[in-house]
Amino acid sequence: MKLSELPDDHPQKPAYLGRRLPPEERYDAVVIGAGIGGLVVGILLAKAGLKVLIAEQHYVAGGYCSTFRRKGYVFDSATHFYPLLGNEETITGRLLKDLGIPTRWVKMDPVDQFHFPDGSRFTVSADFDTYVARLKAEFPEEAGALDGFFNEVRRVYYLGLLHYFRWRESEHLEPYRAQTLRQALDRHFRNPKLKLLLAADVPHWGSPPERTSFVFDSMLRLSYFLGNYYPVGGSQVFADDLARRFEALGGHLCLRALGRKILTENGRAYGVEIETGLPLRRVRRTVLAEKIISNGDLLRTYDEMLDPGETDPDAVAEVRRLRPSMPCFLAHIGMRDISGEMLDDISGYHWDSWDSDAVGQSALRFKIFSPTRFEPRMAPEGGQVLIIQRVREMDYDNVVDWPSHKAALEADALTRLAALIPDLDRRIVVMSSASAQTSYRYTLNLKGAMLGWEMSPDQLGSGRPEVTGPVDNLYFVGHWTRPGGGITPVIVSAMRVAELITASPAAIGSGRARGRAAAEGVPP
């Protein structure tokens, strides 16, 4: 079959996205960056009737939600699980349906798996009651504490949804706002293994439990049981579906288009200088617009794109004091002659220490994920894709030899993986790895940060940069702004900005729908 004859959701089908036409001189809105936040805000604005340009510096759309191909294998560049998006009863799932996004989703069950230093493991069911029953069977002496903990998690989930996703103040959130996951676990439990189990997926935050918000962790914890999904065809299919919808609404998506400067005058943004074209034929163009939305790295926006005279030095200093989330080392492996059952056995987080606060050092060996267990077409017939992920607490600026740094991490990962998979070398068909610098090179995220600013209590809410910029007509979407990092918060930031620009709540549904979303599907 020819590539052009493949269905749109096939992971091997090329993405014919991005007009080859250069940007026009004027738009109603220009979005800098085609990550998920940039794509969603572009769709919402185009749907509202605005003339919109999305300028993306990479040659594909999606940011961290993209894929690449090697020898017939398709690999997710970074993001590989998508809570809520396949559930039409949730805020983001309903939005995708309302926008006509055709992506199909595979529900992941089990949600996750944890391997402990004592050789035992725990599998997280997608059913909340089953999950809690297994916890109580494993830790009967903590049964009462588990009930108390999850009662609190439900309450915090609801309050956090109202505050961080609906911008509604509540005095009932105050006792929890400054609390870390570590503090909550220590308050409820004594058993160190149970504490690790309940923090065992903390690497997805890119921060240790002692610096991770209990509120945000509670929101993600319960979202798993409303549905954790993988896109049919892989991450790029989801990004491409968004991009195609944007173009169908009349939007102009321009790839290989780097935002160089945001033009400002008298405290307002009025345009963007964009560099377009192939590497040896780059051209800088000025594009005028009523509204500018940055989906890029916030410090780069301040340092490289805005005139220092147009920003408050104290505000910029506050941004500089924020801590980015940890970067992640990734190894993408195309394999043959390995059974799905073996991959199921070894998938999940592998912990070598009971100290989850050392997650970015030596406590976490790695996480193993196999997308072909959900979407077999990511590999040639008979093949499997395996992704190794390891968060790293590191001094990015002092790495002097990135190739050697990456090679050392890759060798260590393979040595440890060989202890789990016999004859590993024989089974590997192709391998590609990515360091923090790789993540930076393709996405321009500060130091390769996984999720923008760290989701610590002091960096959420008023402690996180708001979606409105330091000058009029400038807005931010994505994980460097409110409400935070992760696929749902990123989409919520886009919904918020679209609402502000169009001066209409229609961008996120009717008031009645918003009320339902505030209490959507909290597990009983």
Where on the chain are the PLM-derived regions?
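Extreme N-terminal leader/targeting segments of oxidoreductases
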Residues: 1-29, 47-48, 456, 468, ...
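A glycine-rich dinucleotide-binding beta-alpha-beta segment and adjacent secondary-structure elements
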Residues: 191-205, 367, 423-483
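N-terminal glycine-rich phosphate/pyrophosphate-binding loop and immediately adjacent elements
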Residues: 13-152, 455
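Short beta-strand to alpha-helix junction loop
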Residues: 89, 169-183, 223-245, 254-256, ...
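Mid-domain catalytic core of redox enzymes
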Residues: 260-380, 518
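C-terminal segments that line or cap access tunnels to active or ligand-binding sites in enzymes
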Residues: 336-438
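Helical element adjacent to the flavin cofactor pocket in flavoenzyme catalytic cores
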Residues: 218-283
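Rossmann-like flavin
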Residues: 117-212
